[in-house]
From Swiss-Prot:
Protein role: Specifically methylates guanosine-37 in various tRNAs.
Main location: cytoplasm
Keyword Glycoprotein: no
Protein name (record): tRNA (guanine-N(1)-)-methyltransferase
GO molecular function, one term: tRNA (guanine(37)-N1)-methyltransferase activity
Catalysed transformations (reactions): guanosine(37) in tRNA + S-adenosyl-L-methionine = N(1)-methylguanosine(37) in tRNA + S-adenosyl-L-homocysteine + H(+)
One Pfam family in the UniProt entry: tRNA_m1G_MT
Lineage of the organism: Bacteria, Thermotogati, Deinococcota, Deinococci, Thermales
Family affiliation: Belongs to the RNA methyltransferase TrmD family.
This enzyme's EC code(s): 2.1.1.228
Enzyme class per UniProt: transferase
PANTHER family: TRNA (GUANINE-N(1)-)-METHYLTRANSFERASE
Gene: trmD
Listed NCBIfam families: PRK00026.1, trmD
Length: 239
Protein backbone atom coordinates (compact mmCIF):
# COMPACT_ATOMS: atom_id res chain seq x y z
CA UNK A 1 0.00 0.00 0.00
CA UNK A 2 1.30 3.45 -0.90
CA UNK A 3 0.74 6.78 0.84
CA UNK A 4 1.51 10.34 -0.22
CA UNK A 5 1.30 12.91 2.59
CA UNK A 6 1.19 16.52 1.39
CA UNK A 7 2.13 18.99 4.13
CA UNK A 8 3.80 22.32 4.79
CA UNK A 9 5.77 20.69 7.61
CA UNK A 10 7.28 17.41 6.36
CA UNK A 11 9.58 17.20 9.38
CA UNK A 12 6.52 16.73 11.59
CA UNK A 13 5.63 13.58 9.64
CA UNK A 14 8.96 11.91 8.83
CA UNK A 15 10.06 11.13 12.43
CA UNK A 16 6.79 9.27 12.97
CA UNK A 17 7.83 6.85 10.24
CA UNK A 18 11.18 6.09 11.88
CA UNK A 19 9.89 4.14 14.89
CA UNK A 20 8.03 0.99 15.82
CA UNK A 21 5.76 -0.94 13.45
CA UNK A 22 5.59 1.71 10.74
CA UNK A 23 9.36 1.65 10.43
CA UNK A 24 9.34 -2.15 10.17
CA UNK A 25 6.52 -2.08 7.61
CA UNK A 26 8.49 0.38 5.48
CA UNK A 27 11.69 -1.67 5.75
CA UNK A 28 9.83 -4.83 4.70
CA UNK A 29 8.16 -3.09 1.77
CA UNK A 30 4.64 -3.68 3.11
CA UNK A 31 3.88 0.03 2.79
CA UNK A 32 5.49 2.99 1.03
CA UNK A 33 5.20 6.59 2.25
CA UNK A 34 6.18 9.70 0.30
CA UNK A 35 6.13 12.97 2.24
CA UNK A 36 5.68 15.95 -0.10
CA UNK A 37 6.64 19.48 0.96
CA UNK A 38 3.80 21.75 -0.15
CA UNK A 39 6.14 24.74 -0.12
CA UNK A 40 8.05 23.22 -3.05
CA UNK A 41 5.01 24.20 -5.13
CA UNK A 42 4.84 27.73 -3.74
CA UNK A 43 4.79 30.78 -5.99
CA UNK A 44 7.60 33.21 -6.70
CA UNK A 45 10.95 33.72 -5.08
CA UNK A 46 9.51 33.31 -1.59
CA UNK A 47 7.56 30.12 -2.41
CA UNK A 48 4.29 31.68 -1.25
CA UNK A 49 1.61 29.11 -0.45
CA UNK A 50 -1.13 31.16 1.21
CA UNK A 51 -3.04 34.42 0.96
CA UNK A 52 -5.60 36.50 2.86
CA UNK A 53 -9.22 35.30 2.78
CA UNK A 54 -11.71 36.97 0.45
CA UNK A 55 -14.34 38.80 2.49
CA UNK A 56 -11.89 39.51 5.28
CA UNK A 57 -11.23 37.63 8.48
CA UNK A 58 -8.35 36.36 10.55
CA UNK A 59 -5.61 34.05 9.36
CA UNK A 60 -4.36 32.91 6.00
CA UNK A 61 -5.77 30.39 3.52
CA UNK A 62 -3.74 27.91 1.45
CA UNK A 63 -4.08 28.78 -2.24
CA UNK A 64 -5.88 26.28 -4.50
CA UNK A 65 -3.33 26.56 -7.33
CA UNK A 66 -0.51 25.58 -4.96
CA UNK A 67 -2.43 22.73 -3.31
CA UNK A 68 -3.71 21.25 -6.57
CA UNK A 69 -0.26 21.43 -8.19
CA UNK A 70 1.11 19.28 -5.36
CA UNK A 71 -1.88 16.96 -5.53
CA UNK A 72 -1.70 16.43 -9.29
CA UNK A 73 1.97 15.49 -9.01
CA UNK A 74 0.90 12.64 -6.69
CA UNK A 75 -1.77 11.26 -9.03
CA UNK A 76 -3.00 8.74 -9.98
CA UNK A 77 -4.42 7.69 -6.62
CA UNK A 78 -7.34 5.58 -5.44
CA UNK A 79 -8.40 8.16 -2.86
CA UNK A 80 -7.53 11.79 -2.13
CA UNK A 81 -8.31 12.48 1.52
CA UNK A 82 -8.52 16.08 2.72
CA UNK A 83 -8.21 16.30 6.51
CA UNK A 84 -10.52 18.93 8.00
CA UNK A 85 -12.54 19.49 11.20
CA UNK A 86 -15.50 20.00 8.83
CA UNK A 87 -15.17 16.49 7.38
CA UNK A 88 -17.09 13.30 7.99
CA UNK A 89 -15.95 11.34 11.07
CA UNK A 90 -13.00 9.02 10.50
CA UNK A 91 -14.08 5.68 11.96
CA UNK A 92 -12.77 2.13 12.04
CA UNK A 93 -15.19 1.30 9.22
CA UNK A 94 -13.69 4.06 7.07
CA UNK A 95 -10.20 2.84 7.95
CA UNK A 96 -11.14 -0.63 6.71
CA UNK A 97 -12.49 0.82 3.45
CA UNK A 98 -9.32 2.84 2.84
CA UNK A 99 -7.02 -0.04 3.78
CA UNK A 100 -8.19 -1.89 0.69
CA UNK A 101 -6.80 0.79 -1.63
CA UNK A 102 -3.42 0.79 -3.35
CA UNK A 103 -2.57 4.51 -3.12
CA UNK A 104 -3.89 7.14 -0.69
CA UNK A 105 -3.08 10.84 -0.90
CA UNK A 106 -3.48 12.67 2.42
CA UNK A 107 -3.79 16.47 2.33
CA UNK A 108 -2.78 18.10 5.62
CA UNK A 109 -3.68 21.78 5.88
CA UNK A 110 -2.46 24.64 8.07
CA UNK A 111 -3.56 28.13 9.09
CA UNK A 112 -7.26 28.56 8.16
CA UNK A 113 -7.08 25.49 5.95
CA UNK A 114 -7.30 25.04 2.19
CA UNK A 115 -9.25 27.25 -0.19
CA UNK A 116 -12.68 25.59 -0.42
CA UNK A 117 -12.15 24.88 -4.13
CA UNK A 118 -9.56 22.24 -3.20
CA UNK A 119 -12.45 20.10 -1.92
CA UNK A 120 -13.50 19.53 -5.54
CA UNK A 121 -10.29 17.53 -6.05
CA UNK A 122 -10.74 15.31 -2.96
CA UNK A 123 -12.62 12.01 -2.90
CA UNK A 124 -13.19 12.27 0.85
CA UNK A 125 -13.08 14.98 3.51
CA UNK A 126 -12.41 13.41 6.90
CA UNK A 127 -12.23 14.64 10.49
CA UNK A 128 -10.66 12.82 13.44
CA UNK A 129 -12.84 14.62 15.99
CA UNK A 130 -14.86 17.64 16.98
CA UNK A 131 -11.90 19.85 17.85
CA UNK A 132 -9.39 22.01 16.01
CA UNK A 133 -5.65 21.29 15.81
CA UNK A 134 -2.87 23.58 14.62
CA UNK A 135 -2.58 21.58 11.42
CA UNK A 136 -3.67 18.44 9.62
CA UNK A 137 -0.49 16.43 10.17
CA UNK A 138 -1.74 14.63 13.29
CA UNK A 139 -4.97 13.76 11.49
CA UNK A 140 -3.06 12.50 8.44
CA UNK A 141 -0.89 10.32 10.68
CA UNK A 142 -3.99 8.96 12.41
CA UNK A 143 -5.40 7.87 9.05
CA UNK A 144 -2.03 6.44 8.01
CA UNK A 145 -1.63 4.42 11.24
CA UNK A 146 -5.21 3.17 11.36
CA UNK A 147 -5.07 1.91 7.77
CA UNK A 148 -1.47 0.66 7.70
CA UNK A 149 -2.05 -1.63 10.69
CA UNK A 150 -4.75 -3.40 8.63
CA UNK A 151 -2.32 -4.20 5.81
CA UNK A 152 -1.49 -7.94 5.99
CA UNK A 153 1.84 -8.52 7.73
CA UNK A 154 2.15 -5.11 9.41
CA UNK A 155 0.88 -6.49 12.72
CA UNK A 156 2.33 -9.87 13.65
CA UNK A 157 -0.89 -11.46 14.94
CA UNK A 158 -3.89 -10.85 12.63
CA UNK A 159 -6.19 -11.71 15.57
CA UNK A 160 -4.95 -8.56 17.30
CA UNK A 161 -6.84 -6.10 15.12
CA UNK A 162 -9.88 -8.38 14.82
CA UNK A 163 -10.39 -7.88 18.58
CA UNK A 164 -9.75 -4.12 18.62
CA UNK A 165 -12.20 -1.54 19.88
CA UNK A 166 -14.88 -0.66 17.29
CA UNK A 167 -14.23 -3.71 15.06
CA UNK A 168 -17.36 -5.40 16.47
CA UNK A 169 -19.02 -2.05 17.14
CA UNK A 170 -18.04 -2.00 20.84
CA UNK A 171 -15.09 -0.78 22.87
CA UNK A 172 -12.39 -3.32 23.67
CA UNK A 173 -12.50 -5.29 26.92
CA UNK A 174 -10.07 -4.35 29.76
CA UNK A 175 -6.60 -5.88 29.45
CA UNK A 176 -4.39 -7.11 32.32
CA UNK A 177 -0.85 -8.46 32.70
CA UNK A 178 1.54 -9.38 35.55
CA UNK A 179 1.68 -8.97 38.51
CA UNK A 180 -1.66 -10.56 39.50
CA UNK A 181 -2.01 -8.04 42.34
CA UNK A 182 -0.79 -4.43 42.37
CA UNK A 183 -1.39 -2.10 45.32
CA UNK A 184 -4.49 -3.98 46.35
CA UNK A 185 -5.90 -4.16 42.82
CA UNK A 186 -6.30 -7.74 41.61
CA UNK A 187 -6.64 -9.21 38.15
CA UNK A 188 -10.13 -10.76 37.81
CA UNK A 189 -9.95 -14.41 38.85
CA UNK A 190 -11.61 -15.64 35.67
CA UNK A 191 -8.59 -14.48 33.63
CA UNK A 192 -6.31 -16.65 35.79
CA UNK A 193 -8.58 -19.70 35.60
CA UNK A 194 -7.49 -21.05 32.21
CA UNK A 195 -11.17 -21.66 31.36
CA UNK A 196 -11.35 -20.32 27.81
CA UNK A 197 -15.15 -20.22 27.51
CA UNK A 198 -15.49 -18.31 30.76
CA UNK A 199 -12.72 -15.93 29.73
CA UNK A 200 -14.49 -15.24 26.43
CA UNK A 201 -17.80 -14.67 28.21
CA UNK A 202 -16.13 -12.28 30.68
CA UNK A 203 -14.47 -10.35 27.85
CA UNK A 204 -17.73 -9.91 25.94
CA UNK A 205 -19.50 -8.85 29.13
CA UNK A 206 -16.83 -6.32 30.11
CA UNK A 207 -16.68 -4.90 26.58
CA UNK A 208 -20.42 -4.28 26.84
CA UNK A 209 -20.12 -2.85 30.34
CA UNK A 210 -17.29 -0.50 29.32
CA UNK A 211 -19.14 0.62 26.19
CA UNK A 212 -22.34 1.30 28.15
CA UNK A 213 -20.37 3.39 30.64
CA UNK A 214 -18.19 5.35 28.21
CA UNK A 215 -19.90 5.29 24.79
CA UNK A 216 -23.52 4.18 25.29
CA UNK A 217 -24.55 5.39 21.82
CA UNK A 218 -22.40 2.64 20.27
CA UNK A 219 -24.41 -0.16 21.89
CA UNK A 220 -27.63 0.90 20.16
CA UNK A 221 -26.14 0.40 16.70
CA UNK A 222 -23.67 -2.43 17.37
CA UNK A 223 -24.41 -5.77 15.62
CA UNK A 224 -24.59 -7.79 18.85
CA UNK A 225 -24.09 -11.54 18.81
CA UNK A 226 -26.61 -13.79 20.59
CA UNK A 227 -24.23 -14.08 23.54
CA UNK A 228 -23.78 -10.31 23.75
CA UNK A 229 -27.55 -9.76 23.55
CA UNK A 230 -28.07 -12.21 26.44
CA UNK A 231 -25.33 -10.56 28.49
CA UNK A 232 -26.85 -7.15 27.86
CA UNK A 233 -30.26 -8.41 29.02
CA UNK A 234 -28.64 -9.83 32.18
CA UNK A 235 -26.97 -6.48 32.91
CA UNK A 236 -30.30 -4.70 32.44
CA UNK A 237 -31.93 -7.07 34.96
CA UNK A 238 -29.09 -6.47 37.44
CA UNK A 239 -29.85 -2.75 37.37
Amino acid sequence: MRYTVITLFPNLVRPWLEESLLKKALERGLIQVEVVDLRAFGLGRHRTVDDTPYGGGAGMVIRPDVAVAALERALPADEVVLLSPAGRPFTQKVAEELAGKEHLVLLAGRYEGFDARVEAFATRILSIGDYVLMGGEVAALAVLEATARLVPGVIGDPQSHREDSFVRGLLDYPQYTRPPEFRGLRVPEVLLSGHHQEVERWRRQEALRRTLALRPELVARAPLSLLEARLLAEMDREE
